[in-house]
Amino acid sequence: MYINGVNLGNWLVLEKWMSPTLFYGTDAEDEYYLPRSLPQDVYESRIKIHRSEYITERDFATIKSFGLNAVRIPVPYFIFGDCKPFIGCIEELDKAFNWAEKYELSILIDLHTVPGSQNGFDNGGISGVCKWAKQPESVQFTLSLLERLAERYGKRKGLYGIQILNEPITEKMWDLFDIQNRYKPVDEEMAKGSGPISLKFLRSFYIDAYRVMRKHMPEDKAVVFHDGFDLKSWKDFMREEEFKNVV
C-alpha cells in the first residue's frame, strides 16, 4: 500500500505549542503536569471539549477529499482510562475507526507516550524525564497496552498498522539533543536516573512487541517501529522469516 496521509497530532496526545489555551492558568509544559495544575473538573472539561472539537468526522471527509488515503493517530499510554488522573480516549479512537472506514481511509495507530517517557520530549508526556526503559513494570505495561490495541483493532478494515513506540531516544541522540537542558524537568528528583535507551534493549523490546501484537493482527496489517534516530543501526533487523510486514 502506498501511503499518502496526514498526522492527527495534538488530538489525543497534547502538545502545548499547538493548543496553548488548554494550558492557560497553569505553569504546565506537558501533559503530565496539566491535570496536576488544574482542579479536576476544569481539567476534565477542557479535555473533553478539546477532543470533541479538535478532530471531527468533517476532518476525515476533508482528508479524503484531498486525495489522501491514511491518517496517523498518536495515542497516549492512558488511552484505556486506567492511569489516573488522566482521562482515557478509547472512545475517540473507536470513532476515528468508524469515520476512517466510512471514508475509506486507513489508520496507523502510534503509541506516542509511555510511563516514565521514552525520550524526555514535551510530546513524550513529561519533559526532561526518560526512565521508561529502566522500569520493568512500565515496559510490561506497554507490552500489555500494545496487545490490547492489537486485539481491539487488529482485524478492523480501517487499520493500516500499529507503530510500537514514537521516537525512543538512543545513545547517539541523547547528547546531541541535550535533552535535559532543552526540556527542563520540573522535578529534578523524578528526573534522576534519566538517560538514553540502548539499541540492545530497543531491539529486544521491538521483537517482544511484534510477537504480542501479531497474535491479534493478520499479516496484512503492518507493525511499524521507529529507528531511534539511528537509521543505519537497523539494516539487518527483523530480516528473519518470522517477521512479516514490518515497516
Summary of predicted features, one role per range:
Residues 6-10, 73-77, 109-113, 163-166, ...:
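A cross-domain feature marking catalytic cores of carbohydrate-active enzymes
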Residues 2-5, 16, 28, 117-247:
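Active-site region of glycoside hydrolase catalytic domains
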Residues 44-71, 81, 85-113, 123-164, ...:
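An active-site-proximal structural segment forming one wall of the substrate-binding cleft
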Residues 1-68:
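N-terminal carbohydrate-binding accessory modules
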Residues 37-40, 73-77, 128-129, 188-190:
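A short alpha-helix capping/helix-coil boundary motif
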Residues 79-82, 232-233:
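Short, solvent-exposed loop/turn segments at secondary-structure junctions
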